[in-house]
Regions:
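Non-catalytic terminal segments and appended small domains
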Residues: 1-136
């Protein structure tokens, strides 16, 4: 889930759903693809992209794994203690007045997942996907 913050010269505030939507639809979308069903009252859910990087237990190298054929009915399982790197399906084009922070949804935290705290995107961060670090 991404929380988007509006920066004015004196204040910072969380964007409401209608503000996120207005900035994600149109000619210069802040997040693309924008899926309306993923919009929450003050945040936007993001989707893991088709590839993750998994640590090889034999030599600690990262191995690219294609998870694109996995679904809710056929999930790719993150084993206890396992750590993976992934990236969002979404590409971000934040204007100079908006920053974003990735936080784990509480339902995933209750399932035992954790993520590193590197999920910050500065104002003006554009043309990139967000790297996410997940651990079970």
């Amino acid at each position: 889930m991404i929380i988007l913050l509006q920066h004015n010269y004196e204040t910072v505030g969380v964007l409401a759903d209608w503000q996120i939507r207005s900035r994600c639809e149109g000619d210069s979308p802040m997040v693309e693809p924008f899926v309306l069903d993923l919009l929450n009252p003050a945040s936007l859910d993001v989707v893991l992209g088709p590839y993750i990087m998994v640590e090889d237990p034999n030599n600690f190298d990262l191995v690219r794994v294609d998870i694109s054929d996995h679904t809710e009915d056929n999930p790719w399982l993150l084993d206890p203690g396992e750590f993976v790197l992934g990236e969002t399906r979404e590409t971000f084009n934040l204007p100079n007045t908006i920053s974003a922070q990735f936080v784990l949804k509480s339902s995933r935290a209750r399932a035992g997942y954790d993520h590193a705290l590197a999920g910050w995107a500065d104002p003006g961060w554009a043309g990139s996907k967000l790297t996410v670090e997940l651990k079970n």
